[in-house]
């Protein structure tokens, strides 16, 4: 499945292209319906999928009751996250994953290696017009 990059304004006044995917989450434990769609950044440098706490709260998670962990971004600063089992909805697929939640995330969500890349082969193609990426589902035994 092919998707166009999303064009986002930068702090420097220009624009940048991001590989972002329409995403939803649901609370697996409560069999709840998925939340409203939001854009999640595809980030091969992220170890796991991380979402803003407000999204977890909207599906009934008690964020601070999750398994406490830490993640470190490119700044080198450690950020406390809370892990929860959720259902991740991406176009055409529903995945059961363990994801981190924090109120320190400056965007709605990040799709990382554990939880996303382990299920998809992602091919980035910034040379196409418009620039885009392709997702191919990996089915494991």
Task: Provide a role label for each language-model segment.
Residues 1-141:
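Pepsin/retropepsin-fold aspartyl endopeptidases
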